[in-house]
């Protein structure tokens, strides 16, 4: 066996040949992944090698190599029975590997999906999509792919070498991913951001979609309907302050503008705020001035308050008013600092859980061509975080 806790060597084949010549029954190679494609190089080595080979990439970037080891022909993988006794960086506890990822059911024909993000450790997309696939009897597995911003192009250019069928896209890739697509779904060109990739089974052509727009508006409508007697389905909002100017902010701003809402953008990068404001015929305020004017609704479309930095908020509590609607797109945790403080003031609150489940359900339809088990998806998210509920 061979271990390298710093990198994945360039000449994996040469290393394997050296170990195989030692008259080994099984060759094991474990290296640290510094690039997402290190997983691919390792798995391709496993698939083409004799004698039987176990090739694993360590670290968070290396997660796919551990889950897909069997699909590529590895003799076995490693998983600690006790999650408190992780012996190597990136090891996945046995229960998670077997129950969430269904490792024993993965075969060469299993379709692979995942989420590309940086960071990705907080994402509960694997929990939700794997539960949905299991409930629907779909032969698929959904993985977290840690893809730093500078590596997006390399990963997508090599996507044909993976058994990938589709990807969710989140921070920081929602805007950049559009430029790599062969085709686009509705609204993507107008918004300039996508959160979903589908790969054609035969041509491997990449089509991008945006399921955030309808999910965001529907989440607000559903939450307000539950909190307002006689709510007729229209938002009833006149002015909305959106915090952030990234992919999620773009989708929400576009969806709200379609509802006739006046949108104001505030982010730490004025240029990005101006670009988004022009897209939706909205206004811009500097980040430092976001508290100065009253709004019917405040939307947090930044990662502020996301796990593990749960004690941060993008909007100071002293500026919240009881008549406001507060929508936080962060779903992990569901009850962010912003949500708690808005609830204390008496605001109507929309948590990120409803938007998350709705956009994931639309992704499920795109990938699998059937209605999603939304109840299962909500329950999986509920078990992973806190109770899914409308806060009154």
Q: What are the roles of these predicted feature ranges?
A:
Residues 143, 264, 350:
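Conserved beta-strand positions in the Rossmann-like core of class I SAM-dependent methyltransferases
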Residues 110-226:
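Phosphate/diphosphate ligand-binding glycine-rich loop within oxidoreductases
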Residues 57, 112-120, 210-213, 220, ...:
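Glycine-rich adenosine-cofactor-binding loop
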Residues 1-109:
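Catalytic alpha/beta core domains of metabolic enzymes, predominantly
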Residues 278-349:
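Rossmann-like adenosine-cofactor binding region
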């Amino acid at each position: 066996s061979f271990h390298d806790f710093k990198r994945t060597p360039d000449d994996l084949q040469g290393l394997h040949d050296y170990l195989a010549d030692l008259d080994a029954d099984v060759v094991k190679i474990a290296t640290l992944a510094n690039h997402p494609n290190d997983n691919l190089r390792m798995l391709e080595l496993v698939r083409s090698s004799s004698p039987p080979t176990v090739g694993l990439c360590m670290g968070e970037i290396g997660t796919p190599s551990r889950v897909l080891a069997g699909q590529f022909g590895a003799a076995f993988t490693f998983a600690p029975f006790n999650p408190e006794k992780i012996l190597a960086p990136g090891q996945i506890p046995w229960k998670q590997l077997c129950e969430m990822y269904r490792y024993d059911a993965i075969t060469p024909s299993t379709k692979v999906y995942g989420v590309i993000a940086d960071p990705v450790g907080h994402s509960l997309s694997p929990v939700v999509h794997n539960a949905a696939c299991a409930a629907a009897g779909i032969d698929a597995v959904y993985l977290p792919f840690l893809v730093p911003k500078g590596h997006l192009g390399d990963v997508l250019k090599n996507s044909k070498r993976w058994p990938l069928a589709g990807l969710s896209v989140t921070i920081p890739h929602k805007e950049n991913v559009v430029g790599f697509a062969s085709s686009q779904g509705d609204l993507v060109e107008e918004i300039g951001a996508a959160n979903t990739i589908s790969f054609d089974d035969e041509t491997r052509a990449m089509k991008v979609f945006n399921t955030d727009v309808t999910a965001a508006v529907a989440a607000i409508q559903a939450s307000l309907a539950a909190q307002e007697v006689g709510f007729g389905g229209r938002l009833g909002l006149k002015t909305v302050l959106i915090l952030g100017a990234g992919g999620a902010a773009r989708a929400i701003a576009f969806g709200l503008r379609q509802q006739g809402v006046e949108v104001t953008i505030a982010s730490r990068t004025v240029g990005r705020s101006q670009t988004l404001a022009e897209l939706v015929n909205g206004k811009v305020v500097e980040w430092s001035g976001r508290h100065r004017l009253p709004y019917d609704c405040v939307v947090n479309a930044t990662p502020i308050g996301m796990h593990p930095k749960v004690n941060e908020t993008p909007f100071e509590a002293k500026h919240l008013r009881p008549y406001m609607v507060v929508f936080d797109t962060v779903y992990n945790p569901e009850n962010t600092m912003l949500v708690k403080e808005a609830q204390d003031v008496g605001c109507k609150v929309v948590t990120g859980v409803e938007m998350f489940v709705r956009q994931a359900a639309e992704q499920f339809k795109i990938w699998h061509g059937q209605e999603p088990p939304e109840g299962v998806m909500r329950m999986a998210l509920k078990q992973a975080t806190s109770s899914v509920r409308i806060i009154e």
